[in-house]
Amino acid sequence: MNSSLQVGIGIDVGSSSARIGVYNYYNDALLEMAQEPVPYYQDSSKKSWKFWQKSTEIIKALQKCLQKLNIREYEVKSCGVSATCSLAIFERDRTSNMLIPYPNEDNVIFWMDSSAVNECQWLNMQCPQQLLDYLGGKFVPEMGVPKLKYFLDEYSHLRDKHFHIFDLHQYIAYELSRLYEWNIEGLLGRENLNGIGNDGEVSGWSSSFYKNIINLPSNVSIGTTSLVANKHISTTVVRSCIDSYASWFAVASPHLETSLFMIAGTSSCYMYGTTISDTRIPGVWGPFDTILDNRGDFSVYAAGQSCTGKLIEHLFESHPCARKILKDGADIYQVLEQTIRDIEKNNGLSIHILTKDMFFYGDYEGNRTPFADPRIKGSFIGESTDTSMLNLTYKYICILEFLSFQTKLIIDTFQNENSNIHIKELRISGSQAKNERLLSLISLVNNGVAIIKPKENVDMMGIKGAYVLAKSAKEKKQLADVITERDISNDSEKFESLAEYRLGNDSILLRKLLCVKYHIHLDMAKQQKRYHKLVDEVFQHL
């Protein structure tokens, strides 16, 4: 290694792994990449949060990656960190001033945790509607602020302790800066221009929000507030963000206002950028005003669903035929695709015609957007005692239909009559971008919308976007300028749908069927809300 080689680092901490990429600072070429597993834990019987991680395991995994990459042998110009929208909790030792995981090593409330239902109800009653409209109309349990409120109600009475609560990405960036003696100036807590925390995370809110609504105790600090900056003078610039935004930064279209980005993995998130706007879109988060620049010239809107790719994982984990395929070591997606082709050939009908009487709704972890309703759950009409390969295939198709309908609902929500948004292309990254049948369905149910994919490995977009984030800060450039001025035509490609899903090739009957099933999809959500209301009425006068 040559210590004079100047590099930038991109870090992406996802739901189950940590990845680090080292990029040539001057030509943006990926030089090396390292990856380590990072587990999350689940126990639905716990009284407190049900999903968690350990910050110690995350940092150790990242240190292993950095050691593999011999990072100290480079001249590091910048480091970008992206991580899930989880919450990290620490107690500050009064003697050493060190941060200690609290209440024990299980100190990261995982993004997937939705325990803070009561706290959401309290916040939605306390906050003015004008504020809530920036969050799609309501706080939802997976956001950072409800998780913070949950923690405060449990622990803030312990006045002999001083707590630090971080958005996970900010903590990781702070801790790595401390360990590697990088500059943390860019991580110091600042209010967003409109005083709203991006995606409901704990940083970025106005001081009046924490004082007047949350009533934040004096023994609780948010992020790096009151932490002493390292004394080392370093020119290595460090920045951090939620992982979904990093993936967007990597592949965002220069034509922001006609392009919607979708990062689709375990969950799915959507991002849309436009020139500054104060328009609130019902069911959509935003506008947020400091993500693409700090001048207030651009607004960002976001939406998301908690359980998307996880639906397929759950099917594979729970269905006996899927378990056998996985046990045998076969590629389950290839097996399913071949089975679909065989079924269609033998029946002379589209697989969707054969599943016409099966209706799946998959908000297993509640609905983030556009309904902001944690009580909505999964449902399936068409269940039987069948556990054959045919049944597995049909259920897989039903999940793909649900995911395509869900994406259509998000696009329709963005394009409501008052938003003045017109989506011409959908850019997709993440593990679901590898599923050609799913992408074909999404395009078809959205009237043939163009789907753009990265040419590079879709799993690498998080580290690339994190690198872009920090490099732009190092060069004192606005992200919006970097995105709108660059040419990424060689980095992305238009996806060609499978023949049976292309407009003009698909049968009129199939298109009519999917249209009807989309309206059934909407009705299934509506009926759940109706059932909840009927049940609630039983308890109103007790």
Swiss-Prot record:
Matching Gene3D superfamilies: 1.20.58.2240, 3.30.420.40
Protein name: Protein MPA43
Additional facts recorded: Present with 1050 molecules/cell in log phase SD medium.
InterPro entries assigned to the protein according to its UniProt record, in alphabetical order: ATPase_NBD, FGGY_C, FGGY_N
SUPFAM superfamilies given in the database record: Actin-like ATPase domain
GO CC annotation: cytoplasm; mitochondrion
Gene Ontology BP terms: pentose metabolic process
PANTHER family: PROTEIN MPA43, RIBULOKINASE
GO MF annotation list: D-ribulokinase activity
Organism of this sequence: Saccharomyces cerevisiae (strain ATCC 204508 / S288c) (Baker's yeast)
